[in-house]
Every structure is written in structure tokens, then in C-alpha cells.
């Protein structure tokens, strides 16, 4: 699924507020999946999730040139839950995430 969940909207609102406060701030947005589907599907899904997050932020008035969005599929798992490993739903959820990295932290004063 690549829609924005209500709990994710709260986090995206925080990002928007920070980007409004610091108009020169640029971010890289990286979306990740768990390992339960085929690698190619997960790559596509994470790309759609990244695009959805970026589009949501842009709809709030942030210039799209300030955001780079990229999907990583299941290439950067945060735990042992790779292909064929039996894990709980909570463990898989940890891998389904979007991370934000500030590209130019020097603009935050």
C-alpha cells in the first residue's frame, strides 16, 4: 500500500512545519519495505511510497525542488527479517518506514 496513513500524516506535518520554518532546508526522503514480497515489487512499492510522501508535502505548499524522494525496497532492513526468515508482524513493520535526511543542516540556526 502506498497511501498515507493518519499516523504518518502527523509525522509529515512535522516535516512541513520544519521546512516552513527553514525555507532553504532540503531533504532526502527514503522509503523502505519489509521483505515479504518479491524484490522487484518491493522496489516499486517503496518508490510509490516515497512519491506519495513527497506529493503530500508538496500539496502543503513546499517547493518540490527541496525534496528528493527515493525508494529502497528491502535493501536496507533494520533487523534480521530478510527473505525466508520467520518474523512477527511487529518486526516486519519496523522495516516498513520512510526516513528523512536533512541535506543542508547548516541552514538551521
Regions found by a protein language model. Give the residues of each.
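Extended extracellular/luminal ectodomain segments enriched in beta-structured repeat modules
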Residues: 22-26
